[in-house]
Amino acid sequence: MGNNVVVLGTQWGDEGKGKIVDLLTERAKYVVRYQGGHNAGHTLVINGEKTVLHLIPSGILRENVTSIIGNGVVLSPAALMKEMKELEDRGIPVRERLLLSEACPLILDYHVALDNAREKARGAKAIGTTGRGIGPAYEDKVARRGLRVGDLFDKETFAEKLKEVMEYHNFQLVNYYKAEAVDYQKVLDDTMAVADILTSMVVDVSDLLDQARQRGDFVMFEGAQGTLLDIDHGTYPYVTSSNTTAGGVATGSGLGPRYVDYVLGILKAYSTRVGAGPFPTELFDETGEFLCKQGNEFGATTGRRRRTGWLDTVAVRRAVQLNSLSGFCLTKLDVLDGLKEVKLCVAYRMPDGREVATTPLAADDWKGVEPIYETMPGWSESTFGVKDRSGLPQAALNYIKRIEELTGVPIDIISTGPDRTETMILRDPFDA
């Protein structure tokens, strides 16, 4: 039996993690975010009602679940307050269900200003960040000048630290980027206005998780973005600023690494990517447009159109290695309904003609990489909302089986629609 279950994306994000986390939290006592910030966009549809969460864990809608934001998450007080208000306006008692690590780095206005100034300065070489200050906040953390939730307990010292760090960043903004300085007093006043709310939710997350483990409580760890955006293992520099892989669970929450029992990789039935960066199977034809339209591939956070392409099992195999995946949840299978044929990328052809079965590491090494495809018959029948494996067309079952063969990982869950009821759980991670 797996008490500590990790749910993470195996591609470039947007795989459908939010729905699956929400579904599986029916049995969980805690749901933990361990990396990223409000650059994530988790969309839940329950009884036809849509909820988009960016920072608060997807378990917040469950009455008997405690949601936790771990130390690996960079926390924007403004974004958190906005999200809390939206949920509280709908009658959800967020403050009774949400806990924070005091070690969460804070995202403040100057981080956002830096993020946008840098993207503007990069011009055509822009990374395609969400412009929400995520990267600069992680930089401050590593440089040991960042302000954290725990600093808010001593307001006088916080004000002094803020003044010092803002002098540093404003100098950079004005003199290097030729941008406007950020107003110190406004940042201080805005942060102080919510300081007591934030500190009232602080808990020792590592200790809480260890006690939960000893009691045998079920805990779900909710990843943001996807494996191929990992700061260390992704398509650098076109990556996010955190560890999106399973290793980030231990460092971003304080759970001992030996206590992870099951890692569920969310796998979209095709590939998508937002922003710049390598994408060997990207489609620029009618099929690419079809996938975008049928899959409603527009970012929950930015509204940007996602790039679309065939499923890349070479890249997914890298995710299998990095995360020691226990099983997959296959999502958006229904988007492929109606295609005469479906393709799987099974290898890459390098510019020198070599065939390789593993992904390059740096973004520059992906240049000129061509996908080698295996083509399979598609299906005309609808898989939307199918709740039993026997109801799937044979061609869809063949597609699922081939993914399992190419990756060496079983597909334990199949999602056939956005609602939590439109799901087949073949093997429950908490029972694995």
Swiss-Prot record:
One of its GO terms (cellular component) is cytoplasm. It is found in: Cytoplasm. It catalyses: IMP + L-aspartate + GTP = N(6)-(1,2-dicarboxyethyl)-AMP + GDP + phosphate + 2 H(+). Its cofactor is Mg(2+). Keywords: Cytoplasm, GTP-binding, Ligase, Magnesium, Metal-binding, Nucleotide-binding, Purine biosynthesis. Pathway: Purine metabolism; AMP biosynthesis via de novo pathway; AMP from IMP: step 1/2. GTP binds at residues 13-19, 41-43, 306, 332-334, 415-417. Binds 1 Mg(2+) ion per subunit. One of its GO terms (molecular function) is GTP binding. Substrate binds at residues 300-306. Mg(2+) binds at residues 14, 41. Homodimer. Plays an important role in the de novo pathway of purine nucleotide biosynthesis. Catalyzes the first committed step in the biosynthesis of AMP from IMP. Belongs to the adenylosuccinate synthetase family. This is Adenylosuccinate synthetase. It comes from Shigella sonnei (strain Ss046). The gene is purA.
